[in-house]
Each structure stands twice: as C-alpha cells, then as structure tokens.
A protein has these predicted regions:
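Short, polar/acidic, helix-capping and beta-turn segments at strand->helix junctions
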Residues: 1-128
Length: 128
C-alpha cells in the first residue's frame, strides 16, 4: 500500500527505482566490473519497462523517454558511472530510436538496497 512501480500524472509517467537481478549484487570497482554493471543496467531498465507496460498497457504508448536516473553502488574512487549507465541508455535507444534519447544523471552511491549494484528511475511522456 502506498507504493506503485509507476505513477501516471497526465501524460507523464514516473517510474520508481528498479534494480538488476540477484546475481548483480555488490559494488562497482570491487565485486562488479564495468561490463557486468552495463549488463545490470540493461536488466534494471527492462524491470522499469515491465512496470511501464503494467501501467499503460503497451510499450508503444511511450512517446518520449525524458529522464533517466542511474544510481551506481560503487567504491569511493570509482568514476565510471556513465559507462555503467550506458547499458540502460543503449537499450532505450535501441528500442525507441530518437524517442529514447533522454536527459540522464549517473551518480555514485555508497550503498543501495539489498547490495544492488545499480538502481534506475525513469520519467517518460506517454500517450493514450
């Protein structure tokens, strides 16, 4: 109660944070490589898209991906968060072309829930 995977306000869909599967637990720069983080970002993005589909019924109703926030669980001196976040960006570009182009923040975190290596949030414009 009180939490939804995605919330629609008018034509804007806010997608809450999603993480990658259990095998992608740990910190970038320690247990997780950049390549593994890239794959984890793709999978976290797919988890977001599952909630998008549940909220609006059809992924073709996405008009524009507006914003992506990629939170990367990493060691303090890790500076390759954008390379990890590219996993999600590349997937959205592949799926939506120009409509997948988005503003993005890729930030390092000291920890994430359940030791997830990445958590992703999205904001999208959708149609009926």
């Amino acid at each position: 109660p009180g939490r939804a995977g995605a919330v629609r306000v008018g034509n804007i869909l806010y997608v809450g944070g999603h993480t990658a599967p259990q095998q992608f637990r740990g910190k970038l720069g320690a247990e997780i490589t950049v390549e593994q983080g890239y794959e984890a970002a793709k999978l976290a993005c797919l988890a977001c898209l599952a909630d998008v589909k549940a909220a609006i019924g059809d992924l073709d109703k996405v008009k524009q991906v507006a914003k992506l926030l990629c939170m990367v669980n990493c060691v303090p001196d890790f500076g390759q968060q954008p390379l990890v976040a590219n996993g999600a960006t590349d997937l959205l570009s592949e799926l939506y072309g120009d409509s997948g182009a988005h503003a993005r923040s890729a930030v390092g975190m000291g920890s994430l829930p359940n030791s997830a290596c990445i958590e992703i949030e999205m904001i999208m414009e959708v149609t009926d």
